[in-house]
């Protein structure tokens, strides 16, 4: 039983409010303000205000409530979600060519997520602290340094984990949503006719009147649904129903009340377009709202940082990224991890973004492309799963696909036009991450194929050992092997150069399945190949961390004990050399070689004692 099933529904729902809805829950800070930004240039008339409110309302209903909560959340891999999970599910029952296309789409979506993660903390924290200028313009020069200080503190505390303060996320975000709803409801009460914007007629009329400008304004409307991917990505932590319950009972009502409250305020006071969120609050409440909004944006930023840690671990375990040092920050929650390299690279990127863009308005143009690009990819992958995995009729899937793309594609295109205004940032970051993941996966495949060609078939080795009976030395030799085909090169080198073998030889392979967790009883498989040669296959899910001590413990339970003092681990250490291929292939090989040199060594990844490791070198052209 999962952790979220063991806890009470109210507790899990409260936790989901604190993590899942942090990003989308802080969107009212900047969304409506950006709808009236100078580059759009629309006046705050009744038709325009109603048009924007209607678009925001139907975006929250159709994209979040219908597409994600009713459709996409059905596509779980044993309870887990996320873009890479969706990619794995979509590729299970399709043809080889289709699988390749889906793989590329999934990696592009993963790259977009990394791009979005860089922007979210910067955008959120800046927009919260900009409330200081509403309280008093004299504090405006301090917004940027305070934002840098807040973000620095956020990334510094990552190594300590969020176990203790994480318990406050839910209550703080609940207070945040209560404040959103209350301020919005008070404003609506003063101008209740604003509720007429619930009618989609106003959205349609908005497009008929303003045409091209209305289309471009979708780039601001989409800010209302940024963070929607978290609903799917965090499904494994909280479960489907608590996420749905938190949305329909807390997040959605509060967001709608606040957006419509901002609209009512602008209709009665057009000057409020400068910062309608903070101007909703009475003057005495502005400072407390700045503090609360800063706390909410820090929580939202923490959620996406934790999300990128989780995605990175999943990508490493599935073979899309090189090995990294992954630290567990909680003895209770396996999902609470810290990846130092990712944390500090992300911090540097966020800092550069904050210093470069300086204001949330400047960042708004950069925000939408990654979000809407991921939305389009999610629609395609989810519909593929619906047809091939769930056996939904092709006609039904086509109707769903076309209907969802009619929403996603216009939102994406409206953001593409903002490419040179800042949209290049997530595209560039996404392209870099896609190139890294695709290169690592492809070049690893080529490397393993090359090593396989250089190896000896398992049957030939066993026959040779039984026939020639080389000299035996006491102890156990464990040879770590990447595949179950052929003999590890370290074993061949040891035999050819030292002409000896250990009394007991174990070929050990660690495999990762595209499921989050593997049944503990299925972790270890032991097979005898000859009287003194054994093969051990250790299988894990992509959310599990392999550990050689656990392998030993499970082997002992199956009757095969190991004495660490008399056991040596032999590893192949490849020296990679670029081959004479095309220029593009050589560039990929150079990137792969650099990634390999900086990746975590296998013995460190599976926690092999350093004093029991023997490395055997081999040169391979890639």
Swiss-Prot record:
The chain crosses the membrane at residues 9-29, 52-72, 101-121, 137-157, 169-189, 213-233, 247-267, 287-309, 337-357, 363-383, 396-416, 419-439. The keyword Phosphoprotein does not apply. It is a multi-pass membrane protein. Disulfide bonds: none annotated. InterPro entries: K+_transporter, K_trans_C, K_trans_N, Kup. It holds the Pfam family K_trans_C. GO terms for cellular component: plasma membrane. GO terms for molecular function: potassium ion transmembrane transporter activity; symporter activity. It is found in: Cell inner membrane. Keywords: Cell inner membrane, Cell membrane, Ion transport, Membrane, Potassium, Potassium transport, Symport, Transmembrane, Transmembrane helix, Transport. Belongs to the HAK/KUP transporter (TC 2.A.72) family. Transport of potassium into the cell. Likely operates as a K(+):H(+) symporter. This is Probable potassium transport system protein Kup. It comes from Tolumonas auensis (strain DSM 9187 / NBRC 110442 / TA 4).
